[in-house]
Amino acid sequence: MSNKVKSDIEIASKAEILPVTTIAEHLGLDADALELYGKYKAKLSYDTIHSLKDKEPGKLVLVTAINPTPAGEGKSTVTVGLGDALSKKDKKTVIALREPSLGPTMGIKGGATGGGYAQVIPMEDINLHFTGDFHAITAANNALSAFIDNHMQQGNDLEIDGRRIVWKRVVDLNDRALRKVVVGLGGPIQGVPREDGFDITVASEIMAIICLASDLKDLKKRLSEIVIGYNYKKEPITVGEMGYEGALTLLLKDALKPNLVQTLEHTPAIVHGGPFANIAHGCNSVSATSTALRLGDYVVTEAGFGADLGAEKFLDIKVPALGKAPDCVVIVATIRALKMHGGALKTELSEENVDALAKGFTNLQKHTESIQTFGIPYVVAINKFITDSDAEVAKLEALCEEHGIPFSLTEVWEKGGDGGLELADKVIAAVESGAADYKRIYDDAWSMEEKLEAIVTKVYGGIGVELSSKAQKQIVEFKKYGWDRYPICMAKTQYSLSDDPTLLGRPTDFVIHIREFIPKLGAGFVVALTGDVMTMPGLPKKPAALNMDVDENGNAQGLF
């Protein structure tokens, strides 16, 4: 390879890409199993998905991470690279990833299909409109908003209280100006004026529903259970009471089908869904993972942000819906993130600082302990960056050895699957050991307070929970409706184990502050809001979009 550092899109644009029908053949599927979106993308048909249901599932590997820096730690890159490495080890491997959101792509990320020589392709298609899943979800979400406003305009038989509508409109962009809006202005024929707002599409409950629904029947049932707001008696109103679950299911019937693409090294990749990892559960769809498990001997998937958010939700929310727990967990750690947790300034993360690295190591330790709480073996993937010094790498390896933490120095960004062969060996050994003995950290029958305590004490390392007066009243209300039986989906900062984004490393003696709960009954969980969690991001001063363009031949530029 050239010593010149190439951008992701430069690498992807020069890659040999096989017809998606050829990728399907690797999985034992013929062309009739696919619904083609051009030569290189396809959806798997419902007939195909149904035909696989009785097959024995393969082995599942979950990739998570330590608490990240704002730029991320390369979790998707390691997921792709590990998948390619397992393929090189003659394991029939399928990767299951989330779809990127246009908002972060145009904002700060510039793309989210892995990086370097560990990417999913066609990367520009996946990063932009792909097969239209997010647009369908946006349309369904906003159709529901239109149905709500129309119901109020046309007599309001359900006595919807416009002040207590909790359903928001969405758009798949970072647009802070839309966080709070007023709709229905302009006189009686324009609708009933009320306050409204926009979330980003990946924060929509419909996104979470798509990612947890097992089939069309389950999708329709979940859509009917969405709480859109409350009536004048403060009683909840659902989509089912309004009668629109059928129309919403119709809008989403194709979006529920998983998408098949490939990596740079032609490992099959099923890329589908993409809920926020802070406000929702942050995992790709149950349909995608379940299908992948029946097509491959090994499936590598990821969960959003760090193990405190993404992995906990994968294990406590997605696994019960999937019916299959991971056989091994890979925890991605980077030297730059550990230095940040050890007190190094964000502007100095590229500079050698062995002392900060050693101090920040406690963050990694906590995440390894949390995964062990779930009874699953793990391997730490040290995702090597070109700015890491030899002294820093040696120090981190020594710390892992000293504390009995299994690890592998991983260089998939630079070397593709070849850079993850040792990691693949250690993952295979962990999987084949049969050591996985999965257990959730709480039971659905527990009280909401008990579930919160379990997450905070066992996963975050805190000492307890403090409920606002609003949250306390909501718990009483939720018990009345039976909503306390749902799993808890914590909405908190990804940067810290606590709810304070400035409290880095491994904080102790902290309390998690719950300000309110949001029932997401269609998704099947209750969101617990901590701190200031944003459901509609804003753009940075210099968005990644400033560097994006397209040449006269239609080739994308600036995605990275």
From Swiss-Prot:
Catalytic reactions of this protein: (6S)-5,6,7,8-tetrahydrofolate + formate + ATP = (6R)-10-formyltetrahydrofolate + ADP + phosphate
Keyword Oxidoreductase included in the entry's annotation: no
Enzyme Commission number: 6.3.4.3
Database matches in CDD domains: FTHFS (cd00477)
A GO biological-process term: tetrahydrofolate interconversion
Pfam families: FTHFS (PF01268)
Keyword ATP-binding on entry: yes
Pathway stated in the Swiss-Prot or TrEMBL entry: One-carbon metabolism; tetrahydrofolate interconversion
Entry keywords, A to Z: ATP-binding, Ligase, Nucleotide-binding, One-carbon metabolism
Positions annotated to bind ATP: 69-76
Entry superkingdom: Bacteria
GO terms, molecular function: ATP binding; formate-tetrahydrofolate ligase activity
Family: Belongs to the formate--tetrahydrofolate ligase family.
Protein name per UniProt: Formate--tetrahydrofolate ligase
Organism per entry: Listeria monocytogenes serovar 1/2a (strain ATCC BAA-679 / EGD-e)
